[in-house]
Design a protein with these regions (language model features):
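C-terminal alpha-helical "lid/dimerization" subdomain adjacent to the S-adenosyl-L-methionine
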Residues: 36, 113-169, 179
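A short acidic, Gly/Pro-enriched loop at the edge of an enzyme's catalytic core
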Residues: 65-76
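A short SAM/SAH-binding and catalytic strip from SAM-dependent methyltransferases
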Residues: 75-89
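Short "lid" loop at the C-terminus of a central beta-strand within the Rossmann-like core
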Residues: 83, 111-115, 185
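Conserved beta-strand signature within the Rossmann-like core of class I S-adenosyl-L-methionine
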Residues: 104-111
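Core SAM-dependent methyltransferase catalytic element
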Residues: 173-197
Length: 197
């Protein structure tokens, strides 16, 4: 996304603004962060303000499934941890592609399930035991529940929508040259492509 010298980037499911801030620091573009959680947007605004990026970053309330923007508004788009939380990933991808100019880059970051049996077992143990306990120790009972939810949520998503299905869904949504790269020993995946011209 940053290699195309964009002027305006949309960051969907921006949460507290980590990716939004990174985009603002690595480009001269204006960045719009969108999230459905008012609390996440409050945290994001505090992060943006404390980083001195308020002049180029704006945060708006909205859903990835129904974006409040006209067709072909943005030069590029990113989204993070979104498709596990929507009812219709194909329709959501089409909606994301709709607001990107033809040829514009689209990229996502998502958790994944490692392909290797050994790493998958280690990942399963980590997400079912270590993550909930660490959540509880650092953030209390609420984060314990988040930790317990995350592993099964990721597993169920990839059982329902394996990687080849997701790549096909990107292409079906009007995104060309789709590629993906596993990271963190298979516990994460970056996917990217370009809006059909």
């Amino acid at each position: 996304v940053i290699g195309s010298d964009p002027k305006l980037i949309l960051d969907v499911a921006c949460g507290p603004g980590a990716v939004t801030k990174a985009l603002a620091k690595k480009t001269t573009a204006r960045i719009v962060g969108l999230d459905l959680s008012e609390e996440m947007l409050r945290q994001g605004q505090a992060n943006v303000t404390s980083s001195g990026l308020s002049e180029r970053v704006s945060l708006v309330l909205g859903r990835g499934e129904q974006l409040p923007f006209a067709d072909a508004t943005f030069d590029g788009l990113t989204f993070t941890y979104l498709l596990r939380y929507v009812e219709d990933p194909k329709a959501t991808l089409a909606e994301l592609a709709r607001v990107v100019k033809p040829g514009g880059p689209i990229a996502s970051l998502e958790f994944a399930v490692p392909a290797s049996l050994g790493w998958r077992f280690a990942w399963w143990c980590y997400t079912r035991t270590v993550l909930p306990i660490a959540g509880y120790l650092t953030g209390g009972r609420g984060w314990w529940h988040v930790g317990r939810f995350l592993g099964p949520s990721i597993s169920n998503h990839y059982k329902r929508y394996p990687v080849h299905w997701i790549i096909n869904a990107w292409e079906h949504a009007g995104i060309d040259h789709v590629e993906y790269q596993s990271m963190s020993l298979g516990g994460g995946v970056v996917t990217w492509g370009y809006r059909t011209r």
